[in-house]
Structure formats: C-alpha cells, structure tokens
Amino acid sequence: MSRKQLALFEPTLVVQALKEAVKKLNPQAQWRNPVMFIVWIGSLLTTCISIAMASGVMPGNALFSAAISGWLWVTVLFANFAEALAEGRSKAQANSLKGVKKTAFARKLREPKYGAAADKVPADQLRKGDIVLVEAGDIIPCDGEVIEGGASVDESAITGESAPVIRESGGDFASVTGGTRILSDWLVIECSVNPGETFLDRMIAMVEGAQRRKTPNEIALTILLIALTIVFLLATATLWPFSAWGGNAVSVTVLVALLVCLIPTTIGGLLSAIGVAGMSRMLGANVIATSGRAVEAAGDVDVLLLDKTGTITLGNRQASEFIPAQGVEEKALADAAQLASLADETPEGRSIVILAKQRFNLRERDVQSLHATFVPFTAQSRMSGINIDNRMIRKGSVDAIRRHVEANGGHFPADVDQKVDQVARQGATPLVVVEGSRVLGVIALKDIVKGGIKERFAQLRKMGIKTVMITGDNRLTAAAIAAEAGVDDFLAEATPEAKLALIRQYQAEGRLVAMTGDGTNDAPALAQADVAVAMNSGTQAAKEAGNMVDLDSNPTKLIEVVHIGKQMLMTRGSLTTFSIANDVAKYFAIIPAAFAATYPQLNALNIMRLHSPDSAILSAVIFNALIIVFLIPLALKGVSYKPLTASAMLRRNLWIYGLGGLLVPFIGIKVIDLLLTVCGLV
C-alpha cells in the first residue's frame, strides 16, 4: 500500500520552498554546488557593475547590466527553489512520521517476565537491553524483540497498511517497531536500540535528507560539470583580450552572461533535486532507503535474487492430487492423509482435508471425539500426523518419511520414488504419507505461479537483468517452477550459506546483486548484497543488515525498487544530455551578439536573426533561467521509464533529450527575443 502522494506544487510547500531558496543565497550554501556558485559570483559581480554604472563610476548601459544581473540572481534562486521544493516534499512526508512519535511513558520491568514489578519511566529514557511490558491500547515505546507473549499490533502509522499483524516471541515475527500500537493481549519486549536510534528516528532522518550524501555517480557527474565549467571559464577569460586587441573590448557583463549560458547550469541546478526526489519516490512506494547510494545501486543492479514463495508464486500451496503407492487404493491414501491433517492449521493441511472431502466424500471428523494424539510438525522431524486406534500415520517430506520408515524396519518402495520425481518434475511439492512402516503414497502440493510474472521477467531480461529464483524445494520442483515462471536461473535447496556464496560469486564476476529477506538467517546475505530490501515484518537483524526496508513487507516490491533506481539514473542522464545540448543553441545566440562588432564575419552565426546584440544576450540569459523552472516537474517525477535494452534506451534518450536540447533553446530564445522587442524592453 503506497502513501498518499503530495501534489507536485502543493501551495504550502511552494511558499516554504521560496523562503528556503532565498535563505540558500548565502555563500556557504552555494559553495556545495560549484556550478551554481560560479553563477552566484557572476550575479554578485554584475550587480556591482550595474551599481557602478548607475552611479557614473563606470561607463556603460546600467539598465542592461541590471537586467542581466537580475536574471542571473533569478537563475540562482530557481536552482535553490528546485532543491528546496524536493527537500520540502521529503520533509512533508517525514512530518507524517513525526506524528507517530509521541512522548509517552513505559512500564519498565525489573525482571524479564510477565507479572514482574514495573517502574513507570519516560519512553525516551529507555536504553538498549531494558525490558518493558505493553498491553492492549499501549503504544510500543521502543524498537525491540518480543521475549514473551503474543499480540495483535496496528502498524498502520508506519506502514500505511490498516490490517493488524501478529507479533509473538520466537521465530521471524518477534520484531516490533516503536510507535506502533497494541490492539489485543500483551507483549514483553527487550529494547534493541538506544534513544534516537529507533527505526522511526532513522526513517525521519533519512526522509528529511539529513543523512543524504552524494552518491558515487553524482560525485562523478559533479566532477565532469566542474571540469566543463573550468574549461568554459578559461575560454571566456581569453575572449576579452581578443576583443580588446580587435579594438572593441567586450564588457565584463557580456562575458559573465556568456559564461553562465555556456556552463551546464540546467543540470547543475537540478542535480540535488533529482537525488532527493529519488529517495522521495522510494518512500512513495513505501520503501525506506538508508541513503541515495542505495537508490542509485538499485538502478545499476543486473542480478535479482527472488524468493519463490510470495514473489514468484502465490505462496499458498494447495493439495491437487493423491497418488497411491502400488497395492494401495487412492481412497485409503486420502483417508490417511486427511486424518494426519485434521490438526494441521496450515493452508496446505486444510487443503488436504478439503481435497479428500471433495474426491471421496470423506467428511471432516470431530477432532475432540477421536481421542487421538496429534503429532505437530517440527523443524527437526519435518513430519506431522496422528496416533489413533493403534494406527500411527505421518505425512512429511520424502527424506523425513524415508528415515522414519527405515527407523521402523520398513523399506521405502522404488515406485514411490518414481512418483515423487514425477510430482517434482511437474513443479509440485511431494508429501509422502506413511502408516507405521508402510508407505501409502504421495500428495502433490501445487504452488501457483503469479499471473503476468513471466512477462515481467522478460522485460527485466530486455534490460540486461538476470533473474534467479531462490527456493528450499528440491532441484526437480525448482526446475519446473523456474521454467514455468521464466526465470534465468534458480538455486534449489537453498541455505543461508548457499545464498551468501551465490551473491559473492556474482559479485566476483563484477555484477551488482539485489535480494529481499526477512529472517535472521537472511542477515548475512542481506549484508553482502548491493541492494538489500528487508521486510518490515522481519527481524531486527534483517532490517539492520539491509539498506532498504519495505514497509509493506511485499517481496515482489524488489522489481519496483529496481525500476525506481533506474528511473533516477535515467533522469539524471537525460537532463545532463539536455543541459549540454542547450549550450549549442546559446552559443549561436551570444557569440555573434558579443563579438560581431569586432569580427563581422561572426554575423553568419546569427541564424536566429535576433533583434540586437543586447536582446540576444538578455534572451539567452532569461531562457537559461526559465528552463530550470520548466524542468523541475521532470526532475521531481522522473523521466518516463520503459524497460528497454541499454542501446535502445540510449538511442531513445539521445533523440528526445539530445535533439530536444538542441531545438528547444532555438525556439525559446527566439520567442523571448520577439517578446522583448515587441514590449520595447531592448
């Protein structure tokens, strides 16, 4: 479930962003953006020149210099506004999270058990290792692990999902988040963080951008922009002596205008906004990224490790067939399977009971009246079943039943082995049923592949992304499901060690790997992966190991995360292409205007037939400022994303943003020149 999206130009955010844009005019703020810092210096210099001209200290057109100076300041303000608006949108999203944080009191237990004496203390004084009791109606005061009890918890304040979730001690559902509310029962929680370090605190800090650092690609692009700026600065500086030697020295105001129009101010002014907006779009998808680096890495990912259950398949395996062993009637197998599943409350267990009822009209028997002993499933035995009327019936995995049969002096039939392989090849999971030491047959549990998932994997393949299915199933079952789903590869009988080894193998080949996880056993692999999306419903260890947290706890979200990352990289690349292409048109506007008096041959470059040198220069400067404003929506929303190959994507962007970057300034500068001329402003 995604959070409510803010309007792109929310009035309150726009007003606040305008105020912040003015505050950012101070040199300390401008220094962080070298390209815009040059524009800021140029604005200051031309302001001083226009004042000197107006007071008669310097000769020249004071009105023209003032107009150039004013539009240069507007350029800086627009760049500041773009960044402030992006930050403001993120802070508005963070404010909704701040509403969750409430100064409250907690019941700190003196002993780690329910019923122990408790002290009432402020929640912000709780330390790591403290034990607290929370009951129905209480707000959980800290992040922690449930060590006793079980309760229904409302996590909507964090996740946006209204349906309550169960949190209980033991297993992968013991992690709780501060700021969520207990709906029923009680929990004894051990705090896992100190004040200011909670998940909510980290979310707020990350969303507000307080911890935002430039990503490697952003740093590389900044270095390129600085290099271009230095080249244009040196080139512009050499033009004054050339013009002076020609007998008609160009004014400093014109040279500053030329420099500002030639350096890549468009992308320089929008670069920070693109980075902030990328993290904001992640939050819009209910994913919290720990840094811009994580979002950027998502765009570069070329291997996706996807859990089978819940991501590729629906995750609710259903009994589809009873396959009896040689000499056993199918009805006898169905009867034994139903008995063994009467106390099994899992979806698989209930589906076995229902299938037996549908196939052979075997009505579900009253559990209480059977006077039977039910044997629950355990990770060690990997079986469950029932002891009734001297009958010992079990169902479980092939290996577990084989060990059970051999331990009871029996023999595992070869025909059942063949039936197990047959079920596995069809992409189903085989469960074997045994009574005493006699194997009765196989139950086929069919997991349904999600609709449309094969097409999504085909799109990812077009983009050069390899998909790998991770499953605990045997190789035959895994191979069948992998073929049906259309993944490129699979890892069967996966263990935490196997997942970690696979990630390292791909990284050794120079690939970037993304994966999801929710359990403590996923933590090593999450820590190793380049993009690690931890489920919010998972353990604290998993969330700390990942560099993103999915508040919806939806493993399929990994594909969307990659799309958002790629969209951010595409936006940055597209606007850089557009910005650099812009310079060509501005060159044709300003160079003839500035130097035609000295070198008349340059009039041949005035292909736009602009009205006068002053109108040409002023039109280029105005366009240079306005284009930043027009591109703010694109920087915040991101460019249109389509799953294409790298070469096709490059061609598409060159046509749209390269050619567009050439044509738009020619049209824009000419229109502005006509308006200035018609209005008599030049």
UniProtKB/Swiss-Prot annotation:
Binding site for Mg(2+): 518, 522
Keyword tRNA-binding belongs to the record: no
Enzyme class: translocase
Pfam families: E1-E2_ATPase, Hydrolase
Keyword Translocase appears in the UniProt entry: yes
Gene Ontology terms: cellular component: plasma membrane
Entry's EC annotation: 7.2.2.6
Alphabetical keyword list: ATP-binding, Cell inner membrane, Cell membrane, Ion transport, Magnesium, Membrane, Metal-binding, Nucleotide-binding, Phosphoprotein, Potassium, Potassium transport, Translocase, Transmembrane, Transmembrane helix, Transport
GO MF terms, alphabetically ordered: ATP binding; ATP hydrolysis activity; magnesium ion binding; P-type potassium transmembrane transporter activity
Catalytic activity: K(+)(out) + ATP + H2O = K(+)(in) + ADP + phosphate + H(+)
Catalytic center residues: 307
Membrane topology: Multi-pass membrane protein
Localization of this protein: Cell inner membrane
Chain residues that bind ATP: 344, 348, 377-384, 395
TM annotation in the entry: 34-54, 62-82, 219-239, 254-274, 588-608, 616-636, 656-676
HAMAP family per record: KdpB (MF_00285)
Family: Belongs to the cation transport ATPase (P-type) (TC 3.A.3) family. Type IA subfamily.
Subunit composition and interactions: The system is composed of three essential subunits: KdpA, KdpB and KdpC.
Function: Part of the high-affinity ATP-driven potassium transport (or Kdp) system, which catalyzes the hydrolysis of ATP coupled with the electrogenic transport of potassium into the cytoplasm. This subunit is responsible for energy coupling to the transport system and for the release of the potassium ions to the cytoplasm.
Identification of the protein by name: Potassium-transporting ATPase ATP-binding subunit
Organism: Escherichia coli O127:H6 (strain E2348/69 / EPEC)
Gene name in the database record: kdpB
